[in-house]
Amino acid sequence: MPVVAITREMGSLGKDVARGVSEALGIPVIYHEIIDHLADRMRLRKSHVMRLLDGRAGILERMTADQTSLSIFAAEEIVNAALQGNGAVIRGWGATQLLRDMPSVVCVRVCAPFEVRKQRMLERLGTQDADKVAEEIRDNDEAHAAIMLRHFSIDYTDPEQYDLVLNTQRISVAECVDQVLRVVRSPEFAETEAARQRLQDLGLSCQVRAALRRSPRTRGMRVTVKVDQGRVSFDGAGYSAGERAALCEVAAGVPGVRETEDLMRTINLRARFA
């Protein structure tokens, strides 16, 4: 079950690489499906969701949207996509970072120099307005950088964040596809039982976080969720026994959860302010 997560820059031909990998492996490209599901869950327009995920939403859109819920639900949708069917090529918001620690998932960045991307976009759009196209590319790059920094605390251009970085200035789309296929088919990325379990645990942790966000009892709680072979543990501090019990009760209702464990710490306010 090959899973490839791809991030790209505007004008880098990343969409073409994703499509080529999809066709070669006989697996779908997942992007619009995630947007559709999020729009339904958040009761927002698809265009609104896309701008929020891309970091290009206006101030009014940001103020009227629950961005915390959006990021939690987006993570759930992305990891669920990786778990379903016979594999997938997943494009877009945070997929490379959410899945980068999964042993059998190949995380790819497709890039190209700014001037190369600008020329491609001029040709694609059939325009000679180089300044406008350059501004659009810069805005897109800056928005993507801000989103990745805000949600994952990383510089998305750092090659160490990926298994494979492809510069399409001199490497053709076909060669990029071949490079990805070689990595996907290499022994290092073979799907094992242990690798599958890691991905299932990640998926379950995302489902638990989403369930906690949906429940009025736990919606505002900020805790760390860890999953090991279906066993869910919570870590954090500052919550009452009733609130901690609610965490375990909500998590226990998520399919696949075998047991829950409360590792929360109690803050002794009297000692702290004595």
Residue spans of the language-model regions?
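Glycine-rich phosphate-binding P-loop
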Residues: 5-19
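ATP-dependent small-molecule kinase phosphotransfer cores
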Residues: 35-87, 127
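Short gly/ser/thr-rich secondary-structure transition/capping motifs
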Residues: 69-73, 88-92, 146-150, 216
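Pre-Walker A (Motif I) flank of P-loop NTPase domains
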Residues: 1-4, 8, 86
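Post-Walker A helix-loop "phosphate-sensing" segment adjacent to the P-loop in P-loop NTPases
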Residues: 24-30
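ATP-dependent NMP and nucleoside kinases share a basic, alpha-helical "lid"
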Residues: 88-125
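N-terminal targeting leaders
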Residues: 101, 112, 119-123, 129, ...
